[in-house]
Amino acid sequence: MFKKKLGMTLVEVLVALIIGTISVAAMFYSYNIFNRSYQGIVEKASISKSGRNALSQLARELRNVGYKDINQLQAPLEEYLWKENNVSGFQIGSDSLRIFYDLSPKERIRIDYKLKKYQNSQDTFLSRSFYHWTCTSANNCPVRKEVDEVFINNVEDFQIEFKDDTGKEVKPVNFGAGKANQQRVKSIEVYLTVRSANEIFKKNKNWKINNADQTYPKNDKYTRETFFVSVYPRNIVMN
């Protein structure tokens, strides 16, 4: 008596193989879609968090600009707000900002904000340079602390506008011909455009960014977010 051996025919094997291949391909495709979507969410969350945190700190420092301690051991603070328009050397003409304020009778602070390029790259970040003078006696005030740091990564544009009490732009504002205009500044507007670190779109996307007096187009696979804050410089108003 012969036993019947059960098995799969060649056609059945081929059908099973095809179905398995399709299933694996479908799972791989679904994973890619999910992964790209997840990475996009992570990138956007990172941009939003870094932008909000940076603007919060920047706003606090702008509120201090121009504060003069009446017992300051250095010469009275007369130059405290400076801006350079459309700094060259970048993809986009960004601004550069410098502020001063007294921290105590013995201490004075200077902070510079401007775009810088990463090494061997055209991409830019917003840098923050911090200088801290500490006086040991009258007019003997060496820099005790100096910090140059990456304030926000992947910043494409940084724009500053100074407004007077009628809402009109004040310019120039610097330590030369625009020195007298420091007193006219009643609000400081900051525009900051941050780009994602990685590409997140499958196809290029058109962008048109409008920040203060700066407008520029982009066509790529990155996402972006622009942040804005308007600050009341209370110490300038009191000067």
PLM features: residue spans?
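Surface-exposed loop/linker segments characteristic of extracytoplasmic
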Residues: L77-T166, S187, R224, F228
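Residue-level detector of alpha-helix boundaries and kinks
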Residues: V42-E43, N140, Y216
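Short, aromatic- and cysteine-enriched interfacial helices/patches
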Residues: M1-F2, L81
